[in-house]
Every structure is written in structure tokens, then in C-alpha cells.
A protein has these predicted regions:
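The substrate-binding groove and active-site-proximal loops of carbohydrate-active enzymes
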Residues: 1-3, 33, 37, 172-175, ...
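Aromatic-lined substrate-binding rim segments of carbohydrate-active enzymes
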Residues: 1-16, 268-275, 281-282, 409-410, ...
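Hydrophobic or amphipathic alpha-helical targeting/insertion segments
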Residues: 2-57, 142, 185-216
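Acidic, His- and aromatic-enriched active-site or binding-groove loops in soluble protein domains
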Residues: 3-10, 34-81, 215-220, 224-244, ...
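Aromatic-lined carbohydrate-recognition surfaces of secreted/lumenal glycan-active proteins
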Residues: 20-30, 341-344, 398-431
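Disordered, acidic Ser/Thr/Pro-rich linker "stalks" and the adjacent N-terminal cap
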Residues: 59-129, 140-146, 162-176, 212-264
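Trp- and acidic/polar-enriched beta-sheet ligand-binding modules for extracellular glycan
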Residues: 141-212
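Carboxylate/His-rich catalytic cores and anion/metal-binding grooves
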Residues: 146, 337-370, 419, 435-442
């Protein structure tokens, strides 16, 4: 392969043809087998444990298969343990639904199903004055559906809210969590009977259909970009969420009540003298998104996409590919090699990295630590505060993709006398801004498609 590249560069030099070479194997985007998982794009994952206080507790978390490194261990007191609807406790009737009890058993290993175009679930909670605050749908298979949530008043059902769910494109180019939960914040609605009506595009299996009194960050999985837009051409409004549900202060977790107990973890074990009361322990850790460069040969040119925020990791990637060509091909045989190429962006995003907390403090002026709970949909402080943090998160992702990744690539290229040639856009949910992103390149380019929808972007 290097001999072929050498021949191309030498011939181009002899014929005075300017050459550009992609920054790594494949056209999208920046990765290879030399990138270690700890140098790759990563996301924040978590595990949860419920404990009762009043003394020292020894908590051992199962070791995650995708574990890279611990981040933070946070604890908060569950002053108001809000119930979820359970098939064993509450009265549930359905139409067009199979094995509904498995969807309301709290077990992600069991499934029920929606078996036809239209279906409905009606619930009469056993708890008097049940207050519905959230819905969370965990699907086991792809789903595209529309939901209408209703409460019974004066003998008739009236709509509280409606929403859609789309988990149909499962490839990790559209997010590291293909079947990410669909989480919806519901205006606080007290009632004795609720109905959810559904229009579904195809049969699907559901792990959990959670109707709960517990508040949730609306569309949190989408807001942390674990699941991105499901078509090649996202529009402006697709990354703007208009849910304005607010919860009473005593229903959410206060920042003041979150305790950082990271010093108490050793590997997978937390030993902590737990104060009185019921507590939730959240162990957060980094995991690889698993996204690789493409198209590339497995076992040869394919490997993890490099961290978008870490310039040292980017330099390692650059030196391992571009640097190797420079070392192997004599300077006189590559005089017309002018550009390093970055193609259209098709590799989703990371939402965590080694310097996350320090960067956040220096650029946004506050400590993000308590708000890490919002990655799991836990409302911290208020809906507004939680959403503002997640906006800052996405702002950081966009800024660093532009300035640290493309800006970093440009600086590396300039040191070797190259320019950067960039296609300043991406498909399926680009985690940045085209103008800001392209502004870090020396040259930008477009393309024209004769068919299909990929060219619309």
C-alpha cells in the first residue's frame, strides 16, 4: 500500500498535479487501529444503586463490559420515593398489546409488544391521587410511533400531552445508543385513570413502558446526543426542544443535596458511611462510543475514531498515518502533495473526555459535577437549570469539534507545510455548526448527488 501511495505521489510530482490525502484510512473521518480506546471518542455511562443509610455500606457494582475509567460517584437522598406504575399493583387494560405485564415489571430483560397499527394502554393506579410526571419508553426493537397521553375527568378522557418516538436507525453513526430511551416530561397531572393511545408504524417489542411520578429531563437521551436525528437532513428545529414542563422544587434533586463521594470508590467498589435515610448512589464512568473510521478493512485500516477534544490524541493519530507517509516517501517524490483532507462528518459525537470538568469550569464558569446526573434524565435544581446545562454541553461539543479537532488538524498540517481541505457539513445529526466548523479549515468543499437524499444537506 505504501508503495502504491509512493508511486502516486511521485507521478503527481513529475506531472505537476496537486495531491490531497485523507487524514486517515477511509473518507470519514479521523481514526485507525493505532487509536487506543482511551484515546477514542467516549461517552458518560452510569450504574445506580439504592441503599438505606445509618452506617457503613459496602456497594459492589458489576464491572461494565464497556468500562474505560471511573469519572465521578455521586450520592443524593431520595426524600420522596415516587412510585412507577406496576402490573403487580395497578390495574392495567390494553388493546393491541401483548404481554403488557412485562412492560410494567421493572425488568429490562423482559418484553411486551405493540402488535398492530393502533394500540392503547389504560391504567388505574392503586395509589390515590397518583400524579403523572413522566413517561419513559425502553424499546427492544426499532420503533416509530405517535403517542397521546390522556387523563379521565368527569367521565371522559382529555389529552394532557402528545409526543413522537423514533428509534429506527440503529447504526452508531447516528449515536452510540441505538435504542436510547424515549423520555418525556409530562405536565403534573393528578388523576385516577390514565390512557396512552398509540399509532405505530410496525410491530415492535417494548422492555419497559414507565409511567411515573418521578420527574424526568425531557428528551434527555437526545439532548446528550446519545441518539441523533434519524434522517440525513436534520433541520434547525430538530435540535430545539420546546417542552416547558416545570416541577415543584421538592420533586426534583437539589444541587445542594448531591454529595461527591468519588474518593470512596476503588475499582468497582464503593465503601461509604451512609447518613440516615434512603440514598441513590450513581457511579459514572467513561465508555467508548465504538465508532470507527470508514470505509476501511477490518484488522488493517479500521480502528476507533480519535477523541475530538484532545489534541495530543489527535497528534498521535496524525503522526501514525500522515507522519508514516512522510517518513516513507522522500521529500523530492512528494513536492505536489499540498492538502490534508477531511471528508463529510458522519461519526456522531462524544459527550465526555478527560478534561471535561476543568474545561467546563474555565469556559462556562460553573462546576458541572452535580449536573452529570442529567445524563440519566435526573432533574437537578429545576427543569430550566438542567436544560441550560445540557445546552452548554452541546455548545461545548460544537466548539471543540471545530476548534480542537479541525483547528488542531489544521495546526498539525501547517507545521508540515500542508493546508486543510474540508467538506464543511455532516449527515444524520451533525454535532456542530457548519460555518464554525468550516471556518477552521483552509479550504471548504461541497458535492452534488444525482439521486437520493444524502445530497440535500
Amino acid at each position: 500500500w505504501y508503495d502504491i501511495v509512493h508511486a502516486a505521489l511521485k507521478t503527481a510530482t513529475e506531472e505537476n498535479i496537486e495531491i490531497g490525502i485523507f487524514n486517515g484510512p477511509g473518507w470519514s473521518q479521523a481514526g485507525g487501529p493505532w487509536v487506543d480506546p482511551k484515546q477514542s471518542m467516549r461517552y458518560l455511562a452510569s450504574q445506580h444503586a439504592l441503599v438505606t443509610g445509618g452506617g457503613e455500606r459496602d456497594i459492589v457494582f458489576p464491572h461494565p463490559d464497556n468500562f474505560l475509567q471511573n469519572v465521578k460517584v455521586l450520592a443524593f437522598k431520595r426524600n420522596n420515593i415516587a412510585p412507577d406504575i406496576r402490573a403487580t399493583v395497578d390495574h392495567i387494560t390494553t388493546e393491541g398489546v401483548t404481554d403488557v405485564a412485562r412492560m410494567f415489571d421493572g425488568d429490562l430483560n423482559t418484553t411486551g409488544g405493540f402488535e398492530r397499527d393502533k394500540a392503547s394502554i389504560t391504567v388505574r393506579p392503586s395509589k390515590k391521587d397518583f400524579t403523572l410526571r413522566s413517561i419513559r419508553i425502553e424499546s427492544a426493537t426499532p420503533i416509530r410511533a405517535y403517542f397521546s397521553v390522556k387523563v379521565k375527568r368527569n367521565g371522559a378522557f382529555e389529552e394532557v400531552c402528545s409526543f413522537g418516538a423514533d428509534r429506527t436507525v440503529l447504526k452508531n453513526e447516528v449515536g452510540y445508543d441505538g435504542l436510547a430511551p424515549t423520555a418525556v416530561a409530562v405536565p403534573e397531572t393528578r388523576g385516577e385513570e390514565f390512557m396512552v393511545e398509540m399509532n405505530i408504524n410496525a410491530n415492535c417489542k417494548i422492555k419497559e413502558f414507565k409511567l411515573s411520578e418521578t420527574p424526568i429531563v425531557d428528551r434527555y437521551a437526545d439532548k446528550i446526543l446519545s441518539k441523533m436525528h434519524q434522517t440525513p437532513q436534520p433541520m434547525w428545529h430538530d435540535y430545539k426542544w420546546d417542552n416547558r414542563v416545570s416541577y415543584a422544587p421538592d420533586a426534583v434533586v437539589s444541587e445542594r443535596d448531591i454529595i461527591d463521594i468519588t474518593d470512596h470508590i476503588d475499582a468497582d467498589r464503593v465503601v461509604w458511611n451512609v447518613p440516615e435515610g434512603d440514598w441513590e448512589i450513581v457511579r459514572t464512568y467513561m465508555a467508548p462510543t465504538g465508532i470507527c473510521n470508514a470505509p476501511a478493512i477490518k484488522g488493517d485500516g479500521e480502528g476507533p475514531e480519535v477523541d475530538r477534544w484532545n489534541r495530543e490524541n489527535l497528534k498521535h493519530h496524525y503522526d501514525s498515518f500522515i507522519g508514516e507517509i512522510l517518513r516513507r516517501v522522500p521529500e523530492n517524490d512528494r513536492k505536489t502533495w499540498k492538502m490534508i483532507v477531511c471528508d463529510s462528518y458522519e461519526k456522531a459525537t462524544q459527550n465526555y473526555g478527560d478534561d471535561f470538568i476543568d474545561y467546563f469550569k474555565s469556559h462556562f464558569g460553573y462546576d458541572p459535577t452535580p449536573y452529570l446526573l442529567t445524563f440519566d434524565g435526573i432533574v437537578v435544581g429545576s427543569t430550566d437549570k438542567s436544560d441550560r446545562f445540557l445546552w452548554d454541553l452541546r455548545r461545548m461539543i460544537a466548539d471543540r469539534l471545530a476548534y480542537d479537532h479541525i483547528g488542531g488538524m489544521r495546526e498539525l498540517a501547517h507545521k508540515d507545510g500542508f493546508g486543510i481541505w474540508l467538506e464543511s457539513y455532516g449527515h444524520w445529526g451533525f454535532p456542530g455548526e457548519f460555518l464554525q466548523y468550516g471556518g477552521q479549515s483552509d479550504e471548504v468543499a461541497g458535492e452534488f448527488w444525482s439521486e437520493g437524499s444524502l445530497g440535500d444537506i
